[in-house]
UniProtKB/Swiss-Prot annotation:
First-level EC class: translocase
Family: Belongs to the NqrB/RnfD family.
N-terminal signal peptide: none
Name of the protein in question: Ion-translocating oxidoreductase complex subunit D
Transmembrane parts of this sequence: 19-39, 41-61, 79-99, 125-145, 220-240, 248-268, 271-291, 297-317, 321-341
EC number: 7.-.-.-
Keyword Flavoprotein among UniProt keywords: yes
Organism: Haemophilus influenzae (strain 86-028NP)
Keywords: Cell inner membrane, Cell membrane, Electron transport, Flavoprotein, FMN, Membrane, Phosphoprotein, Translocase, Transmembrane, Transmembrane helix, Transport
Gene Ontology process terms (BP): electron transport chain; transmembrane transport
A Pfam family reported for this protein in Swiss-Prot or TrEMBL: NQR2_RnfD_RnfE
Subcellular location: Cell inner membrane
């Protein structure tokens, strides 16, 4: 006896859980690179985020009258939590990541019905809520630990996150007292602050003398470009594994690079276009966030348009907005446009003539 089931009758064999695990695996080079340059904070933030996400998802699914284990086993909520944990400052207070994770899971995902129903990237919903609500905590970054006289140990990190003090009673700002105060911001923050009072091209050489930059005549920032390269390597791995498509990251990066390069010829002072590509969350966003299959465009041409739109928004925010990075806002703004993009880029159905032809 044959059993009738709905289409599709053949599929790639890639289960949701397998895809999520591949993405998590591809993030590991950047995860360990972040530990190397910024300490153990990301480990504790990830543990808090994943634990909070699992509990929140369990309760939400239970309240909807469904079996939580059937949904938790796809690892999607763990990936959301890990993305958020790697996006916030590693030494942010513990309540920051808990609030952000709850917002990501409940407001960014479950309120729409769960996995596959959300129109916006859940991790970016949580991140943007935190950035708007707690700007001080979300913009206070520890400089690379190799610049510190006494890098925080694991116990210091635990104490900083949960009490705001190290085991010896020092605050985060006191740990960096021997470094220029601007280094508690990211390189993009530092550049935006610097160029508000320095608008000459010659002032570029004053900027790159700051401790967070390499000190070899370039504007590549210590720790940040290495993390971005690690995300790039992980992203290429996902493309080769056919977990993600190349159109979105390539369109995003090329669009931003072209606009940033063109702007440089107008005399507008900022970090170089190459440095911008390996600063902030550029590679993270291009390969691991913008490519979310639920919230991104699904058509071949739509992916290119969507990626280019993200790149355009990142450029506008970084160069002309108040926020130094802009990747999270750019992705959410582009998510809004996805239904329209997909509507106008639908492939022609086989056997049907194109519009205007008989």
């Amino acid at each position: 006896m044959f059993k009738m089931v709905s289409s599709p009758h053949t599929h790639s064999g890639k289960l949701t859980a397998h895809i999520m695990l591949w993405v998590i695996l591809a993030m590991m080079p950047a995860f360990f690179t972040q530990i190397y340059y910024f300490g153990f904070g990301v480990v504790l933030q990830s543990a808090l985020a994943i634990g909070t996400a699992i509990i929140a998802e369990f309760i939400a699914i239970k309240l909807r009258g469904k079996k939580p284990l059937n949904y938790l086993s796809d690892f999607s909520v763990a990936l959301t939590a890990l993305i958020l944990a790697m996006a916030i400052p590693p030494y942010a207070p513990y309540w920051i990541i808990i609030i952000g994770t709850l917002c990501a899971v409940l407001l960014g995902k479950q309120v729409y019905g769960g996995l596959g129903q959300n129109p916006f990237n859940p991790a970016m919903i949580g991140y943007v809520i935190l950035l708007i609500s707690f700007p001080l905590q979300m913009t206070t970054w520890m400089p690379p630990i190799n610049l510190l006289q006494e890098p925080p140990t694991f116990s210091d990190t635990f104490s900083l996150i949960f009490s705001g003090l190290t085991t010896d009673g020092f605050t985060l700002s006191q740990l960096t007292h021997n470094i220029d105060g601007i280094t508690q911001a990211t390189p993009l923050d530092s550049a935006k602050i610097f160029y508000k009072s320095h608008n000459q091209l010659s002032d570029f050489y004053e900027l790159i003398k700051l401790p967070i930059f390499m000190g070899n005549g370039t504007d590549f920032a210590q720790g940040w470009w290495q993390i971005n390269v690690a995300f790039l390597a992980g992203g290429i791995f996902l493309i080769l594994k056919r977990i993600i498509h190349w159109q979105i990251p390539v369109a995003m990066l090329v669009t931003f690079f072209c606009l940033a390069t063109a702007t440089a010829f107008t005399g507008f002072t900022h970090l170089s276009a190459i440095s911008q590509l390996v600063s902030g969350a550029m590679m993270f966003g291009a390969f691991f966030i913008a490519t979310d299959p639920v919230t991104a465009s699904i058509t071949p041409r739509g992916k290119i348009i969507f990626g280019a739109l993200v790149g355009l928004f990142v450029y506008l925010i970084r160069y002309h907005g108040n926020y130094p990075d802009g990747v999270a806002f750019a992705i959410l703004l582009s998510n809004i446009c996805v239904p329209l993009i997909d509507h106008y880029t639908r492939p022609r159905v086989s056997g049907y003539p194109t519009k205007g032809r008989k």
